Every structure is written in structure tokens, then in C-alpha cells.
């Protein structure tokens, strides 16, 4: 029992009550901690919490098949000690290993078996990292101290701020002459046609009353010469384009 010295809390599972007090006292002296007592036939009805004991000692181990329950009752790296067992130790060791215990060993001279609970809690998980992590490259990381901001006012020149001439936006004006293309779609063909008609009407303007040359006092209300000074009879007067068009 010297290998269990320093364990704080132990459980002694007994089958024979004869000299039980002496065996429990010997375990207390060996460990230096507390020792709880439980009957092997009442083990399945016990309600011990998980990870309650540092050491569990069982006498006559063939009388219990609750090794999984004992595994849960032990703390991580807790010890399981069996003595006074009957039969081949190999079969008992195999059963203990299949229940989750590790580091199982036999002391044939003392007729004892010792096993250990793994150093982690039952049901716990750990992250496994099999692949090597490649160092991340800060490709898109920009330092504000090293990067200068662009002044928006410097993006435009004075030429960019000038408004373009509407006449220069027409496709037909690329030739340098005011001549409409064959399939004109910019409106220049209609504009030139209106100018042509207006010019013809201006040149052929005639007086219907014969008093147009006398001045506004003698002109009709719809006379195209209204507002113009008097002129000599037969004198050719060129009218502005807007005077020959309707105001509505």
C-alpha cells in the first residue's frame, strides 16, 4: 500500500466484514487520507458522483462486474487496486482494460492487480491537429501610416471641368461642316430643313395690305414687319427667323 501514499480520498469495497476495521485503518495509515466503505453487493445501488475518489480498493474482485462504474467514480489518473482475487489474472486484466483502464499490472507474489484511470475525464474531447498550418500572408493588410490619401481635386484638370459644346457632340459635326449624314439621328437633318424653309419664306415675304413700308401705325396686327422702322416701297427687307414662326 505504500505506492498509494498521499492520496486524499479512497473507497474500500469489502465482501467479508471480519476484521474490516483493521483493513480500513491500514488503508488510512498507508494513504494518509479519508476512506469510505461500501459493500460489493451494494455497489450497483450506490450513488457516488463521478470523479469522487483517488483510489478504489476491492477485495475478491470476481464478485463485481461494475468496472465501468468504478472508472467513472475515480478521478483522472486515479488508481484501482484489487486483491484476494480467484482465478487467472489474465482474464481479469483483460476485463479491466476493456472497461477503460490503463497501465494494468500484476503482482503475483502479493496476489494483487493495479490499474489506472486515464489522465482525462470520461467523455472529454481534445482537438487534434494533423495538418501543418501554413503561415497566413497579410496580402490585403494596409497600414494607414504608409498609405497617402489621394486628393479628389487633383483627379480633374481644368479642361475636364469645362462643359462640352452641344454642337460638337453630334455625330454629323465630325466632318467640320454642318451637313447631315445619310441616316442622321442627332436632329441636324431636321434643323437644316427648318432653316431652309425659313430662309425661303423670308425671301418670299410679301405684303398683303401694301402698307407695311409706312410703319407700325399702318401695319396689320399680324404683320411680320411689326417693330421695324418704315422703309421705301419695293425695298428688300430681310426678316429674322423668329418673326416668321408662330409664337404658339
Swiss-Prot record:
One GO term describing the cellular component: mitochondrial intermembrane space
Keyword flag 4Fe-4S: yes
Cofactor(s) the protein needs: [2Fe-2S] cluster; [4Fe-4S] cluster
Domain of life: Eukaryota
Keyword Iron: yes
Motif placement: Cx2C motif 1: 209-212
Domain notes: The C-terminal domain binds 2 Fe-S clusters but is otherwise mostly in an intrinsically disordered conformation.
Motif (Cx2C motif 2): 220-223
Span list, region Fe-S binding site B: 209-223
Family: Belongs to the anamorsin family.
Function: Component of the cytosolic iron-sulfur (Fe-S) protein assembly (CIA) machinery. Required for the maturation of extramitochondrial Fe-S proteins. Part of an electron transfer chain functioning in an early step of cytosolic Fe-S biogenesis, facilitating the de novo assembly of a [4Fe-4S] cluster on the cytosolic Fe-S scaffold complex. Electrons are transferred from NADPH via a FAD- and FMN-containing diflavin oxidoreductase.
Molecular function GO terms recorded: 2 iron, 2 sulfur cluster binding; 4 iron, 4 sulfur cluster binding; electron transfer activity; metal ion binding
Pfam families for the chain: Anamorsin_N (PF20922), CIAPIN1 (PF05093)
Subunit composition and interactions: Monomer.
Main localization (coarse): cytoplasm
Stretches that traverse the bilayer: none
Binding, [4Fe-4S] cluster: 209, 212, 220, 223
GO BP field: iron-sulfur cluster assembly
Subcellular location: Cytoplasm; Mitochondrion intermembrane space
Gene3D superfamilies assigned: Vaccinia Virus protein VP39
Protein name per its UniProtKB record: Anamorsin homolog
Residues annotated for [2Fe-2S] cluster binding in this entry: 172, 181, 184, 186
Sequence segments annotated as region (Fe-S binding site A): 172-186
Residue segments, region Linker: 131-161
Residue numbers spanned by region N-terminal SAM-like domain: 4-130
Assigned keywords, A-Z: 2Fe-2S, 4Fe-4S, Cytoplasm, Iron, Iron-sulfur, Metal-binding, Mitochondrion
Amino acid at each position: 500500500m505504500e505506492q498509494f501514499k498521499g492520496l486524499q480520498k479512497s473507497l474500500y469495497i469489502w465482501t467479508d466484514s471480519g476484521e474490516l476495521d483493521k483493513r480500513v485503518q491500514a488503508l488510512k495509515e498507508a494513504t494518509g487520507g479519508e476512506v469510505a466503505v461500501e459493500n460489493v453487493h451494494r455497489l450497483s445501488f450506490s450513488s457516488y458522483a463521478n470523479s469522487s475518489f483517488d483510489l478504489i480498493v476491492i477485495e475478491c474482485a470476481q464478485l463485481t462486474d461494475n468496472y465501468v462504474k468504478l472508472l467513472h467514480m475515480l478521478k483522472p489518473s486515479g488508481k484501482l487496486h484489487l486483491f484476494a482475487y480467484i482465478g487467472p489474472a489474465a482474464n481479469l486484466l483483460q476485463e479491466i482494460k476493456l472497461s477503460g483502464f490503463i497501465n494494468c499490472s500484476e503482482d503475483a507474489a502479493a496476489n494483487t492487480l493495479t490499474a489506472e484511470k486515464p489522465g482525462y475525464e470520461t467523455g472529454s474531447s481534445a482537438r487534434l491537429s494533423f495538418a501543418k498550418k501554413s503561415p497566413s500572408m497579410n496580402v490585403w493588410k494596409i497600414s494607414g501610416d504608409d498609405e497617402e490619401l489621394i486628393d479628389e481635386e487633383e483627379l480633374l484638370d481644368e479642361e475636364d471641368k469645362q462643359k462640352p459644346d452641344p454642337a460638337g457632340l453630334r455625330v454629323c459635326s465630325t466632318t467640320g461642316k454642318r451637313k447631315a449624314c445619310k441616316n442622321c439621328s442627332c436632329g441636324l437633318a431636321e434643323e437644316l430643313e427648318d432653316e431652309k424653309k425659313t430662309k425661303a419664306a423670308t425671301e418670299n415675304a410679301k405684303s398683303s395690305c401694301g402698307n407695311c413700308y409706312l410703319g407700325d401705325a399702318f401695319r396689320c396686327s399680324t404683320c411680320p414687319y411689326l417693330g421695324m422702322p418704315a422703309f421705301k416701297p419695293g425695298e428688300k427687307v430681310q426678316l429674322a427667323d423668329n418673326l416668321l414662326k408662330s409664337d404658339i
